[in-house]
A protein has these predicted regions:
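PLP-dependent class I/II
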Residues: 1-218
Length: 218
C-alpha cells in the first residue's frame, strides 16, 4: 500500500509470540528499580503494569503509551486498506499499475533530459525512485581528470547544499539507502512533470559550475 497507492507509511506487519516467551520471562526477572520504571511508563495500561505482556507493550509503544486505546491500526485505515485490496483485485488488467508506471517513467525521462543524459534502460525499474551516481556522471561528462579533481575538492553534501541554496531543490544522499557516497536519490512520485526537467537542469548546472572551477585551478 505504501508506494502502490501513495500512502507512504501505511505498512502492515505481523508479530507472533508464544503465550510463554522469553521476553515476558526476562521482564519478571528485572530488578526492583527497573520494574519501578516500567510501572511508571505503563501505569495507564492497568493497576499492575509489570504484568503487562511484552506484545501489549509493543502495541502501546507504537505511539504515546497514554494513547494506547488508539494505538496500532486504526479502523479508518483498516477500511481504506480493504478498499485498496478490493480495487487491486478488480483491476484484472492492471490498468492502474500500467498508468502509474507510464507517468513515473515519463518523469524520469524528463529528469534525465534536464541532466543532458540518456535515460538508463532497466526492465525491472519501477520508476518510483531513481538514484544518480554523480561521480560516474562527472567522469562521462567532463572526463576522468576533471572528475578526480572534483572528487578531491567537493563532497556529495556540498552538491546537495548548492542544489538547495542556488535552486531550491532538495534531494537525499544515496548512501543512506545502501548506495555509493556520491549518489543522490530523486523521488518520481509526487511532483508535476515539469518539475523533474527543472531538477535535472539544476543538477547539471551545479556540476558544470564545479567543473569550470577545477579547470581554472589546473
Amino acid at each position: 500500500f505504501s508506494k502502490y497507492f501513495g500512502v507512504t507509511g501505511w505498512r502492515l506487519g505481523t508479530v507472533l509470540l508464544h503465550e510463554k516467551n522469553v521476553f515476558d520471562d526476562q521482564i519478571q526477572k528485572l530488578q526492583a528499580c527497573e520494574k519501578e520504571e516500567l510501572e511508571k511508563r505503563y501505569t495507564s495500561l492497568g493497576t499492575h503494569a509489570t504484568d503487562v505482556k511484552f506484545i501489549d507493550r509493543m502495541v502501546a509503544d507504537s505511539r504515546l503509551v497514554a494513547l494506547n486505546h488508539t494505538a496500532g491500526l486504526s479502523t479508518p485505515q483498516q477500511v481504506q486498506m480493504a478498499l485498496f485490496s478490493g480495487f487491486a483485485l478488480l483491476d484484472e488488467g492492471d490498468r492502474y499499475k500500467k498508468l502509474t508506471r507510464r507517468i513515473c517513467k515519463k518523469r524520469k525521462g524528463l529528469l534525465y533530459e534536464g541532466m543532458k543524459r540518456e535515460m538508463e534502460k532497466d526492465p525491472h525499474d519501477a520508476y518510483y525512485y531513481t538514484e544518480v551516481n554523480l561521480y560516474e556522471w562527472m567522469q562521462k561528462e567532463w572526463g576522468p581528470e576533471v572528475a578526480t579533481a572534483m572528487n578531491r575538492r567537493y563532497k556529495c553534501v556540498d552538491f546537495l547544499y548548492e542544489l538547495a541554496h542556488q535552486h531550491n531543490v532538495i534531494l537525499l544522499a544515496g548512501d543512506g539507502f545502501a548506495s555509493s557516497k556520491w549518489s543522490v536519490r530523486v523521488s518520481l512520485a509526487n511532483l508535476e512533470e515539469g518539475a523533474y526537467l527543472r531538477i535535472g537542469r539544476a543538477m547539471y548546472q551545479v556540476l558544470q559550475q564545479w567543473a569550470r572551477e577545477v579547470k581554472k585551478l589546473s
